[in-house]
């Protein structure tokens, strides 16, 4: 039986998470993508603590964006999460694509975070 798209994403995410882990020195930039929104968190897995977060649900972004499900919206979230991380002194991160392919909205978020100053 063929796997559903959701199950494929879940399995890929498990494979990715086995290989990467965020620390206090190099936390994990985790991306979750839904049909309408995108969420990014910077997580210290050792302390199990979220250090910075951003999403298209935030009021500051919603006013600026025409749609929350576009690459432009993802890029805005990437810039915002990078800005918040840099304000807290975080420059190095490990990228966790969350089981999604590195393409489209996930790629736009990653490239915007890189251009805003995060290294990964």
Curated annotation (Swiss-Prot):
Spell out the residue ranges making up region: Disordered.
1-23
Q: Does the keyword rRNA-binding apply?
A: yes
Which Gene Ontology cellular-component terms appear in the entry?
Answer: cytosolic large ribosomal subunit
Query: According to the UniProt entry, which residue ranges have a biased composition of type Basic residues?
Result: 8-20
**What top-level branch of life does the organism fall under?**
Bacteria
Give the GO biological process terms.
translation
Against InterPro entries, the record matches this protein to:
Ribosomal_uL18_bac-type (IPR004389), Ribosomal_uL18_bac/euk (IPR005484)
- Protein's UniProt keywords contain Ribosomal protein: yes
Q: Tell me the GO molecular function terms.
A: 5S rRNA binding; structural constituent of ribosome
Keywords attached to this Swiss-Prot or TrEMBL record, sorted alphabetically, are: Ribonucleoprotein, Ribosomal protein, RNA-binding, rRNA-binding
Its function, per the record, reads:
This is one of the proteins that bind and probably mediate the attachment of the 5S RNA into the large ribosomal subunit, where it forms part of the central protuberance.
PANTHER family xref list: 39S RIBOSOMAL PROTEIN L18, MITOCHONDRIAL, LARGE RIBOSOMAL SUBUNIT PROTEIN UL18M
The record's subunit annotation is: Part of the 50S ribosomal subunit; part of the 5S rRNA/L5/L18/L25 subcomplex. Contacts the 5S and 23S rRNAs.
Q: Which HAMAP family match?
A: Ribosomal_uL18_B (MF_01337_B)
- Family indicated by similarity: Belongs to the universal ribosomal protein uL18 family.
Q: What is this protein called?
A: Large ribosomal subunit protein uL18
UniProt organism field = Microcystis aeruginosa (strain NIES-843 / IAM M-2473)
